Amino acid sequence: MSRPYNSNERENRTMQKNITLIYGDCSSPEIVTQAVRVLDKIAEKHGHTFTYTRAYMGGEAIDKFGDPLPAAELEKCKNADSVLLGAIGGPKWEGLPGDQRPEKGLLRLRSGMGLYANNRPAKIWPQLADASPLKKSIVDKGIDFIVVRELIGGVYFGEHKTIEENGEKVAIDVMPYAEHEIERIGRIGFETAMKRRKKLTCVDKANVLDTSRLWRAVMHRLQVEYPEVEYSEMFVDNCAMQICKNPAQFDVIVTENMFGDILSDEASEVTGSIGMVPSSSLGQGTCGLYEPIHGSAPDIAGQDVVNPIACILSAAMMLRYSFDMPAEADEIEAAVNAVLD
């Protein structure tokens, strides 16, 4: 995560940043192109210099190199100040073996860049309130929280095997977490809360899982370092219900990989449109991966009608979290709000 914002230090300060662009597949290049236009306007207005390096990943990399993420393309991303990605995948590549499909490139990119924290905001824009599936009385209280999900640990990255036992198949999936993995994602949760409304909810299943009990022990140690943050804990089943019943209670949710995968998808639905939802993946330092949560929309590719707002908001997140440019990020979000009006 970037260090705390200091308004006096940033006054009249211009920056030079190298951004690696992954245009992606199908309609995705159209949204990245629009996000770059917005970034260029910000650079022009504030005297920043953004330089762009193109990297290939996903379907376009398979077509060009026969590999969803060649080593040279990964290096372009690792050497950048940050990475802006559109969306990858599409029907053209669905018949490929699992390790050769576009999505494998994204997993390798996250791992190769050491990105262990996925941040996905859930925000209801007033102009789209009627599109939310929640009751008006719930929406009117406001929805503006972020799910901080551990990205490269837990059951998705544990041992997976199927064995024969007593004449039948038994499937086993292991859910490991080490203290240092929990501490680094927990710290990002607290730091994110410090930049928002200073409220953090750790979501787990500590009444059943040893991993969740370890999460709580580590989070309690971290809590001492952040006395300004109002810290609480919630079981994942209750959290899934509360996101629908009373989402206004949440500011920042931090949780493990599988729980975060499910809860962040649920959270994106209550906002009314996945076309408005950005995300970031962060690790040690300030370099991150920023992308919209929606897919590559192959059905409308080439028609210039795809909604670029989630990608534009992802660029705003990049300015805020990787480049320490909160004022510039605010300007982009205000512009989006004006367009919706």
Task: Label each residue range with its predicted role.
Residues D25-S28, D81, V148, G189, ...:
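Buried hydrophobic positions in well-ordered alpha/beta secondary-structure cores of metabolic enzymes
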Residues D63-I172, M258-G260:
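N-terminal glycine-rich phosphate/adenylate-binding segment common to multiple enzyme folds
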Residues M15-C26, T53-A55:
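Generic N-terminal amphipathic, Lys/Arg-enriched alpha-helix
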